[in-house]
């Protein structure tokens, strides 16, 4: 705020009987102009994002939705919209308090976390993208919990496990890695911490490695359950 505001200058002037300045007598202090603020938001992309998100929320009968578009090269936010939305220039007449859901709401990220588990596998040196993983008969038991895919994918590569979103393959990979391998990749990606945009109301979600000694907890984290993130955190993690 101080950078944008600037500072007023001062000078002594001579005025005529009508109050008009007729001469500058002394310049006490030159004014300091405030700095410019350039937004990363692209108004065209913001409009398209708003239109498409509203259509998707209505089309799926959802109660709410958020969309954030990030430049993968710079990390700049190009578009950020929520539904339901509101016009800040008009009266607000909504039953539910209006908030910026991209930074205030958190949820289980689900299968969007599987690529991070694959990254942990690649970093371990035990896996390559073409490493084969057996998923037959389409399910397996981890202690008392059954993990299953919608269909039996048989033997697939690590890359195919991401493409086909296989719970079984990803869970088996997680159990084959060191206990905190997946957690460490997620933590390095920024989960569990503030993104630092300065947007008011930002929360960090719930993210901890407590309970990672449990095989069930390790597999759940590998495919995006047992912890929560904000849409902003998830988008930033992919950059």
Task: Kindly give the residue locations of the regions a language model identified.
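Beta-lactam-recognizing serine transpeptidase/beta-lactamase-like catalytic domain environment
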Residues: 15-28, 41, 71-111, 116-239
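Extracytoplasmic/periplasmic proteins that interact with beta-lactams or build/remodel peptidoglycan
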Residues: 1-66, 86-89, 93-97
């Amino acid at each position: 705020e101080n950078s944008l505001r600037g500072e007023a200058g001062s000078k002594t002037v001579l005025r005529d009987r009508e109050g008009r300045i007729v001469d500058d007598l002394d310049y006490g202090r030159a004014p300091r102009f405030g700095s410019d603020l350039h937004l990363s938001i692209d108004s065209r992309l913001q409009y398209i994002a708003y239109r498409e998100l509203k259509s998707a929320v209505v089309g799926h009968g959802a109660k709410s939705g958020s969309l954030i578009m990030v430049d993968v090269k710079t990390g700049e936010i190009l578009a950020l919209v929520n539904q339901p939305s509101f016009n800040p220039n008009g009266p607000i007449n909504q039953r539910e308090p209006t908030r910026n859901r991209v930074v205030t709401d958190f949820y289980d990220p689900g299968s969007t976390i599987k690529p991070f588990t694959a990254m942990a596998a690649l970093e371990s040196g035990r896996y390559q993208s073409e490493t084969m993983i057996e998923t037959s008969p389409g399910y397996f038991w981890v202690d008392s919990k059954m993990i299953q895919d919608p269909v039996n994918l048989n033997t697939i590569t690590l890359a195919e496990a991401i493409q086909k979103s296989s719970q079984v393959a990803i869970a088996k990979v997680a159990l084959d890695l060191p206990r905190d391998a997946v957690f460490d990749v997620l933590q390095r990606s920024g989960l569990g911490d503030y993104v630092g945009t300065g947007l008011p109301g930002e929360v960090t979600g719930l993210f901890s490695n407590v309970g990672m000694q449990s095989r069930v907890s390790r597999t759940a984290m590998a495919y995006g359950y047992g912890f929560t993130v904000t849409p902003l955190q998830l988008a930033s993690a992919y950059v």
